[in-house]
Each structure stands twice: as C-alpha cells, then as structure tokens.
Amino acid sequence: MKILIVDVFGAVNSTGKITTLQYRYMKSRGHEVRVCYRGVREPRIDNPDYVPVAGKLEPGVGRLLSWVTGYEGFCHPLATKRLIQYTQSFHPDIVQLNILHGYFINSHQYIRFLNDHHYRVCYTMMDEYAYMGKCPYSFSCNQFLTGCTGGCPEQKHYPKSFFFDRSAVIWQAKERAYRGFEHIVFTGPGWVVDRARRSQLLRGFDIRELDEPVDFGTTFHPREVQALRTRLNIPATHKVIVTVAQMSNPRKGGIYFLQAAELLARQEDLTFVFVGYDVKQPVTLPHVVTVPYVSSQEELAQYYALGDLFVCTSLADTMPNVCIEALGCGTPLAGFAEAGTPYVAPSAYATFTKTYDIPALAQVIASTPKKSPERSAACHQYAVGRYAGEVIFAKLEKIYQSLIQQ
C-alpha cells in the first residue's frame, strides 16, 4: 500500500524518532512510504522519500503571526498548499498523521481536505492536540470535555498568543474538519485514549489504544557504562539516579528532580545525573552532575543504562518516551503518577508517587537498591515485549488494512 506520514519532525528530534521507525518498518514490509515534515530546526534529511513542506521563512513568520493574532494553525497557507498538492500527487492509500502543530501547517484545513476527498486516515495522538482547541496538553483544564469556549488558562503558553484568546475559534475549526469523517481512526496510549473518548470533539469516533514504539535493537538496550561512570567521577559504591529532561521547559518537571536531590543531600551513597540541563544557573549540590542536551542517541542510551533508577517528574507527557527508553536500557523507573506516566510500566518495574510529593519521591529514591544484571534484563525484556517497533507497527498495519477495507 502507499502510505503518507505527516509529522512536524522527520528524523531524530522528538516524535521524529517514531516517524523514522514507522518509515523503516513499513518500507521493510514492502509498502511505498513518503514522509512530509516541516523541514526546519532539525538536521537535513538526505532521503528523497522525505519531503519538507515548510519553507525556511514561513514557520518563523507564521509563529509571529500566531503570537500576535492568536490564530494558531491558521497562518501557514503556503506549507498547507504544498502538503495538499503533494498528497494529491502521491495519492496514498493511507495518510498517517502524527504531530500537526509546531507552526508548520493549518492542520484543520488539511484534515478537512482529507475528509472531503475521502482519504483513509490514521491519526496517532502523541499528545492531546487532536481533541483540544489550540493546546497540545490539557494540564488542569477540562474544557475538552464540553468544547473550548474561551478563557483558555494556557493562552500565554505554547502555542501562545500575546493578546487574544482564539481557543474557541480553533476548536470550532477542528469540529468542522472532523464532522462526518467516516474513514478515520484515532490511536494513542491508554491515558490519551480514555480522555479522547470522553472529549466533545472525538466522542463517537473509532479510537483504539496503541502504545508508542522505541528502537531497542540498535540503540536502547543494556550496555557497559564503566567508562562513562569514570568520566563523571562517580564512586563505585554510589547508586546513580538519572533523569533526562529539558530544564528550561517547566512541563518537564526538572526542578522536582533537583528538589528530591536536595532532600537527600546528606545520603552519601547517591549521585544524581541530570541530562538536559540547559539553563545558566549552576546547580550547587555537590552530589548532582549536570549534563547539557545530548543529541547522540547512542550517548543518551549510555546515560539511561548508567542509572540504578530513572526518575521522571514530567507534568504533562501522554507517553514519556524517556521512560520507555530507560526501561529498554535496563533501568527501573520512579516518578510522579501524572498524565500518561504511570501507564508506562506496572509496579514490578516502576514506582510512582503523588504529583509534587517530593518527600515521597525522595523516599523511593533513597530505598532503591543498586541494579543487578537480573533486574536490568527483566526491565529490558518487559520494554521490548510491549514497545518494540515490530510489535506496535504490526498492530498499526492491521489498522491500515481495516481502513482500506471500509
């Protein structure tokens, strides 16, 4: 079959990793696959099957217009036109939608086009954008249950608007785009699926639970980390507690990892490693090692494998890939029972506390044992059995086949 994947990212950045896995798997199955992506703010992809739809200037101009007018997803006519034209010329059997925000297309316009022209569509919900107004994450807002009517508590946050709350207008545009769409299936992890089924926008649509895949075979697996441990000057007797998060993004919750480390400052057998620490303010705690953003997936896997425990204090992730990747590298999990995080693994491999309960999180960290080879192998086996690309994409391929048969 002919498959067109649409995602803001095409390669290693964020959901681009999943897009790349989708592309490779479907190609290996003999399908004809193309990827339409934004094409800026990530490394160039030298593959003719990858088609950038946004020019070099349009994403930036559209972002500024969105900030000023509040019309997120309305300010990218040229990229949207290119995407529609490419879809018409390629004429796919399946259109696979991933992340449609990120200042690169008018998503409601494209979905309306797909609806009007009777394309078969699978929309994978890697966040909550499919059933929200302008927002990719709901946080404490429940307007998605009844429809966005204004008064958006996230107006000044991504995708932000300096002056105007257009959330109701954007929600209405999505509602019109979805209306009467017969040949669309929505997929996503359990937490997202539950909310999508209750949402005003997607209530009554075909919504199926599907986890997000990770590349365990070539990258995220247990490995020898003594060289990294030596380079970071971590004593052999210390337990290593790792997080991977963008410190400058409050949604990732890095501050709570540091607060837990501060509570445990007197425990002499712990070293905390914060990967993704991208702010200028130094960490003064002597038992905390900060590492800036790591772009190499191989190096990132070493940090995951280094940990005796991986901590995730994210406040909004629907299915935190960092947790799945850490499990694949043989490291058990701890963190907040927030959003989709507790859906990642059962209690045999993870311990989650009430959100913001730093003393409880610190207690979990303090009591964690050093990781044994048997523990590492068990974590890896669970991750592979549930999240391996061949497992997820075999299910996705069956969804494609069911759409074509409609």
Language-model segments: which ranges?
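Donor nucleotide-sugar binding/catalytic pocket of nucleotide-sugar-dependent glycosyltransferases
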Residues: A130, L145-V225
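Conserved donor-binding/catalytic core segment of Leloir-type glycosyltransferases
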Residues: V214, P235-K252, L258-A261
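Nucleotide-activated donor-binding/catalytic signature segment of Leloir-type glycosyltransferases, i.e.
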Residues: G276-A301
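Aromatic "clamp/platform" in nucleotide-sugar-dependent glycosyltransferases that forms part
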Residues: L315
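Short hydrophobic beta-strand element within catalytic cores of glycosyltransferases
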Residues: P332-G335
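Conserved acidic donor-binding segment of nucleotide-sugar-dependent glycosyltransferases
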Residues: S347-I358, A366-K371
